[in-house]
């Protein structure tokens, strides 16, 4: 992972059950020179994260509602348990984040580092990622 004000290169894992979102995020993030791996189920992503000795991911971006039985929030908890604490987790959701305490509790506990309300414009997502990593390293 290298940091400069204008060029952050991260290892990012993206998990979403919607192929268009996976493709869009893959293209967007690779276009910013990030290394990206995508999964369409939380269970596959978790298996990948826990079954190999990988260079740790810098960031996991996961959808909240996933059909595989493991929600994005459950995946976030497991990521924090099984990977280095330096791995950040962004939870994406189409739900109103103010409608439930579950989201604010996840932020307070450190289970997730950011909650991203969908849809999010590409430039805003990039800004959130850059702000999170630049702030963390200063």
Task: Please describe what each predicted stretch is.
Residues 40-44, 70-75:
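Acidic catalytic/metal-coordinating carboxylates
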Residues 19-37:
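Two-component/phosphorelay signaling modules centered on CheY-like receiver
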Residues 118:
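A Lys-centered signature of the CheY-like receiver
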Residues 70, 74, 85, 95-114, ...:
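Alpha4 helix (beta4-alpha4-beta5 surface) of REC/receiver domains from two-component response regulators
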Residues 16, 63-64:
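Active-site residues of response regulator receiver
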Residues 38-59:
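Acidic, metal-coordinating helix/loop segments flanking the phosphotransfer/catalytic sites
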Residues 50-55, 79-86, 110:
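Conserved phosphotransfer cores of two-component systems
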Residues 1-13, 19, 85, 121-138:
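Non-catalytic signal-transmission and effector/linker regions of two-component phosphorelay proteins
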């Amino acid at each position: 992972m290298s940091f400069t004000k204008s060029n952050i290169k991260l290892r990012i894992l993206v998990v979403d059950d919607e192929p268009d979102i996976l493709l869009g995020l893959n293209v967007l993030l690779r276009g910013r020179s990030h290394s990206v791996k995508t999964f369409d189920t939380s269970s596959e992503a978790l298996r990948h994260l826990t079954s190999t000795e990988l260079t740790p991911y810098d960031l996991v971006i996961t959808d909240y509602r996933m059909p595989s039985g493991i929600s994005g929030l459950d995946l976030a908890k497991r990521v924090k348990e099984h990977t280095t604490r330096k791995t950040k987790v962004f939870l994406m959701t189409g739900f109103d984040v103010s409608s439930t305490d579950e989201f604010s509790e996840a932020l307070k506990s450190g289970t997730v580092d950011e909650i991203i309300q969908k849809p999010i414009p590409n430039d805003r997502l990039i800004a959130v990622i850059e702000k999170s990593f630049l702030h963390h390293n200063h």
